[in-house]
Swiss-Prot record:
It comes from Arthroderma benhamiae (strain ATCC MYA-4681 / CBS 112371). This is Probable cell wall protein ARB_06477. The keyword Hydrolase does not apply. GO terms for cellular component: extracellular region; plasma membrane; side of membrane. PANTHER family: ANCHORED PROTEIN, PUTATIVE (AFU_ORTHOLOGUE AFUA_8G04370)-RELATED (PTHR40633:SF5), MATRIX PROTEIN, PUTATIVE (AFU_ORTHOLOGUE AFUA_8G05410)-RELATED (PTHR40633). The GPI-anchor is attached to the protein in the endoplasmic reticulum and serves to target the protein to the cell surface. There, the glucosamine-inositol phospholipid moiety is cleaved off and the GPI-modified mannoprotein is covalently attached via its lipidless GPI glycan remnant to the 1,6-beta-glucan of the outer cell wall layer. A lipid is attached at residue 203 (GPI-anchor amidated serine).
Length: 231
């Protein structure tokens, strides 16, 4: 009895699996990423259907990439595979009846010409890692460059200030010392001249015999001598 029920269930499942069968061209479907391919099937269920792109080796009710959801079951769909599909991967297109998901069908397995992707999560993870690395490098450059430049800018400023101060002190001190010395010398000369001029004044009382004759002018002396000769 159980064997009969199992066979009956298998037969019903086989009939259900034949719903909306694909019309495969001679030689099978040829998919590539450069031009679209038209899928054709024989509509056998009313309402709408959903098309999914599945990996042939791993098919579950929740797996696959949805190509079209709630599509009118007209028996045709144009499909252009994306280039990031896995290279040399085996794919199949699944058609599912939206009213009864147990009614589905598949195309024969195929490979996509022009696909360049790696494993399913490979390209996404790789791109995220590269972006993070570039952001870190740019941040490191922005932080390091100004820090190493600013100390070198401060050093010349300090040196210039020291040189300027030393020059100012030296220049100011030298003229001042020279002027003071010159002034002292001038003062000494003036003092000497004053002393020389005042020497006759500070002498004792003049000699009556010598001082008068020395003080008389030449004309007056001649007159005096003439008077003395007349006497």
């Amino acid at each position: 009895m159980r064997s009969v029920l199992y066979l009956l269930f298998t037969a019903v499942a086989a009939v259900a699996a034949l719903e909306n069968p694909f019309l495969v061209p001679p030689g099978g479907y040829q998919f590539n990423t450069r031009e679209p391919t038209v899928l054709n099937w024989q509509p056998t269920t009313p309402g709408t259907v959903t098309l999914k792109l599945q990996m042939s080796s791993d098919i579950t009710p929740h797996s696959g990439l949805v190509l079209a959801a709630h599509l009118e079951n007209t028996g045709t769909f144009t499909f252009l595979p994306p280039p990031d599909l896995m290279q040399n991967g085996l794919y199949t297109v699944q058609i599912i009846d939206d009213n009864d998901p147990s009614k589905y069908n598949f195309t024969p397995s195929f490979m996509v010409d022009g696909a360049t992707g790696g494993p399913t999560t490979g390209p996404t993870t790789s791109r995220t890692s590269m972006t993070t690395s570039e952001a870190t490098t740019t941040s490191g450059e922005s932080t390091t460059s100004p820090s190493s430049t600013r100390p070198s800018t401060v050093s010349p400023t300090t040196t210039d200030s020291s040189d300027t101060t030393m020059s100012t002190v030296t220049s100011s001190s030298t003229p001042t010392t020279t002027d003071s010395t010159t002034t002292s010398e001038s003062t000494a000369v003036s003092s000497t001249r004053s002393s020389s001029t005042g020497m006759p004044t500070s002498s004792g009382a003049p000699d009556p015999n010598g001082a008068v004759s020395l003080a008389l002018p030449g004309g007056l002396l001649s007159i005096v001598l003439s008077l003395m000769a007349l006497l």
